[in-house]
Amino acid sequence: MIKGLDISYYQAGINLDTVVNAGYKFLILRAGFTGWGTGVSYNKDDQFETFYNQAKARGLGVGAYWYSCADNYQKGVNEANWMYENCLKGKQFDYPIYIDVEEPRWQTGKKDGVTQAIKGFCETLENKGYYVGIYASDISGFKDKMNIGDLIAYDKWVARYGSKPKYVTSYGMWQSSSTGRINGYNGNLDTNEAYKDYPAIIKNAGLNGYPKNGGGNTPAPAPTIKPSTELKVGDRVRIIGTGNGSSYGDSNTAGGIGWEREILKVYEGRAFPYRVGNSTGTTGFYKASSLQKL
């Protein structure tokens, strides 16, 4: 488990040396937000550039999030494109890029639309080479604002205070408190626990602005982390082993052992990188060792 904080312009003036001294290893920065007045006005966080440069100078891992108002696919795409062009481009991030889903004015009572918005955001940034994820509250977000079963492929950052998440059973990061304190800063802070070695996954997969050769000093991952180059999108495969029912999908949704399916997408850097399915669109997630190329 790795401890980190998430901050925005509300924490302007915080001395990041105090963050390092308190034992925190990463920061998730608010890159920007969509204004709730129109739901389509995009704004960079006033402290994003400052915090990014200060964090990198101190060796802190950095991720980012976008406060979303999107309630359909195209709005999700638009938010992602604006974030990329104005916040992400030319930088390197050691932690995922998240869509923050909590806006009550635009994202309440629209589960189907919000689900599509999340897909639009995540697919757009994945296609640009980013490791993406979803931030939301355990109940009021993941349960009430989206169809989580349609978003199995994406990493989850779950907010729940007082106890670990209960509705979301598979997640990479937990926001455990909004009242964290550190010496030298007179204010509350959001505290987080990461359960994956995101810097290693991201750097070795060449994502989030890092070179494809796995740039950085992080050791190479275990063989199961990096997808086999022998399998690619469009290949027909036979399922010869089980998929992953806890992190990225349920193998049973793609058919049993011995069934023939097609590789629909490859998620570099994931332990179960191959999404397979058939003409009905049902999918499951597998390692290369569980698939036989036909």
Short names for language-model regions:
Residues P219-E268:
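Beta-loop motif signature
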Residues G269-V276:
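Short aromatic-glycine-enriched beta-strand elements
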